[in-house]
Amino acid sequence: MFPFRRNVLAFAALLALSSPVLAGKLAIVIDDFGYRPHNENQVLAMPSAISVAVLPDSPHAREMATKAHNSGHEVLIHLPMAPLSKQPLEKNTLRPEMSSDEIERIIRSAVNNVPYAVGINNHMGSKMTSNLFGMQKVMQALERYNLYFLDSVTIGNTQAMRAAQGTGVKVIKRKVFLDDSQNEADIRVQFNRAIDLARRNGSTIAIGHPHPATVRVLQQMVYNLPPDITLVKASSLLNEPQVDTSTPPKNAVPDAPRNPFRGVKLCKPKKPIEPVYANRFFEVLSESISQSTLIVYFQHQWQGWGKQPEAAKFNASAN
């Protein structure tokens, strides 16, 4: 009996020692950096495993990206993308109908404005990320900068993973939004949900914002994680299995370019246009051709063929 108990205890101890290896990985990304330095500095005072996403055209973008990097935090570009709903948009918001050159220009500008960025995630973007051809243009641009894409999943049928196929861009997906509600109790519920998903699936990504309520909850909870949960940077999950739940678009054709004459009113003719019949068309065409300079020239040449010049006639008669 005693040897059996010793074996059970030894097995339990082995499991306890191996638990860090089997720990669930939790990545937390805080979006919308660049507008509220006071709140954002509080986030930067937390463990460096928390990643931050900076809006590229925000007033403090470069400052906060540099601070985050110097504090050991991973920096992403929080790239504005067009939503389906009508709402105020950030400068340089990506839209599906933009050309590849325009999208590349915006991403290049964002990279310049947010130093030390290693990835990009979308700010809003339900319209953009659900458009396969628009996202293919995004992925082609990202590949040039060796950036990964964190899909914020603002719409169920996001095409990000499908669009990245054939490129070197790695895509990971958000699983939990921490603060759709800014009530602290609700944020705690979402934080615990992220922990449960990390435990169940091996890893998960939660996204929040530097709201005062979110900052307070993070300050309480990130220092009291369960022993089987490890806080990690978002990029450490790039090799974790990802499931593409999207469906291909029904009509897989690119968006038509914008018609520059759309909305322009055409003037109505004062008189009805007279019909042009075929016989009259050919008469006019024949007259036009016969009076052309080239035809007249050939006519003169043709009339002169076979006729000897006057000087030649005189010489011939003299001989």
Curated annotation (Swiss-Prot):
InterPro entries, A to Z: Divergent_DAC, Glyco_hydro/deAcase_b/a-brl
Keyword Signal: yes
Entry keyword annotation includes Signal: yes
Region forming the signal peptide: 1-23
Single Gene Ontology BP annotation: carbohydrate metabolic process
Pfam family, one: Polysacc_deac_2
UniProt KW keywords: Signal
Family: To H.influenzae HI_0755.
Protein name: Uncharacterized protein YibQ
Organism: Escherichia coli (strain K12)
